């Protein structure tokens, strides 16, 4: 093992990277509430893993979506556990995100020079809520269907562009297969990619600027 490590160390300088990560200064005022962001990140990783596992069995069609979810819950080995963990961690992610935003706001972590860190965090908060809205519809049961119908109908109240936005979200005049396809694409590709990009930016800025000082 020593020779393998030496081979990688010679080429990648792993030890210097590890020393840089482990030697980062942590202000003395930091407490357990500063870990909430990390918990949110952990929930996101759980979501990615369990969600990816379910894509092997889920079928994003109005005719088969509900049956495929039932199949995951009753026939797939540990499918019920994977889906349950996905649901529980989704709720936990939203809760931790709210607590993290409150902690940052109350401790002044959004002030100069960390405005952009705050902006990326707000964008990720919007993505998190969007995960919930799009994921709620995927079983395509009565609750999911009517939730989509109500949510996609909200922009209709916007003057001039409202009807066009509704049609864009639904993929047509009414809620149907095009709507489910769009929500599935948003939930499994667009939102995870956007969240990962802004999360990387968020972490890099925190790494560069450090943790904000006490009020």
UniProtKB/Swiss-Prot annotation:
One Pfam assignment: Cytochrome_B
Family: Belongs to the cytochrome b family. PetB subfamily.
One GO term describing the cellular component: chloroplast thylakoid membrane
Note: Heme 1 (or BH or b566) is high-potential and absorbs at about 566 nm, and heme 2 (or BL or b562) is low-potential and absorbs at about 562 nm.
Role according to the record: Component of the cytochrome b6-f complex, which mediates electron transfer between photosystem II (PSII) and photosystem I (PSI), cyclic electron flow around PSI, and state transitions.
Protein's cellular compartments: Plastid, Chloroplast thylakoid membrane
Topology class, membrane: Multi-pass membrane protein
Record-listed heme c binding positions: 35
The keyword Metal-binding is annotated on this UniProt entry: yes
UniProt-recorded name of the protein: Cytochrome b6
Residues that hold heme b 1 according to the record: 100, 202
GO molecular function, one term: electron transporter, transferring electrons within cytochrome b6/f complex of photosystem II activity
Gene3D superfamilies referenced in this protein's UniProt entry, alphabetically: Cytochrome Bc1 Complex, Chain C
InterPro entries registered for this protein in UniProt: Cyt_b/b6_N, Cyt_B6_PetB, Cytb/b6-like_sf, Cytochrome_b_N_euk/bac, Di-haem_cyt_TM
Residue spans crossing the bilayer: 32-52, 90-110, 116-136, 186-206
Matching PANTHER family: CYTOCHROME B
Binding note for cofactor: Binds 2 heme b groups non-covalently with two histidine residues as axial ligands.
Name of the gene encoding the protein in the UniProt record: petB
Keywords recorded for this protein, A-Z: Chloroplast, Electron transport, Heme, Iron, Membrane, Metal-binding, Photosynthesis, Plastid, Thylakoid, Transmembrane, Transmembrane helix, Transport
Taxonomic classification: Eukaryota, Viridiplantae, Chlorophyta, core chlorophytes, Trebouxiophyceae
């Amino acid at each position: 093992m020593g020779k393998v490590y030496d081979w990688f160390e010679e080429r990648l300088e792993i030890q210097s990277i590890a020393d840089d990560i482990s030697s980062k200064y942590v202000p003395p005022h930091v407490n357990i509430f500063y870990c909430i962001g990390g918990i949110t990140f952990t929930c996101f990783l759980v979501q990615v893993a369990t969600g990816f596992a379910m894509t092997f069995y889920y079928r994003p069609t109005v005719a088969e979506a509900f049956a495929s979810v039932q199949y995951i819950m009753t026939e797939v080995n540990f499918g019920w556990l994977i889906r349950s963990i996905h649901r529980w961690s989704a709720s936990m992610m939203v809760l931790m995100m709210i607590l993290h935003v409150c902690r940052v706001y109350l401790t002044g972590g959004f002030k100069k020079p960390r405005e952009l860190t705050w902006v990326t965090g707000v964008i990720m908060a919007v993505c998190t809520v969007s995960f919930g809205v799009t994921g709620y519809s995927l079983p395509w049961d009565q609750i999911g269907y009517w939730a989509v119908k109500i949510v996609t109908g909200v922009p209709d109240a916007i003057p001039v562009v409202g009807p066009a936005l509704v049609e864009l979200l639904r993929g047509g005049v009414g809620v149907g297969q095009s709507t489910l396809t769009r929500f599935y694409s948003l939930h499994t590709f667009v939102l995870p990619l956007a969240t990962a990009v802004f999360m990387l930016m968020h972490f890099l800025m925190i790494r560069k600027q450090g943790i904000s000082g006490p009020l």
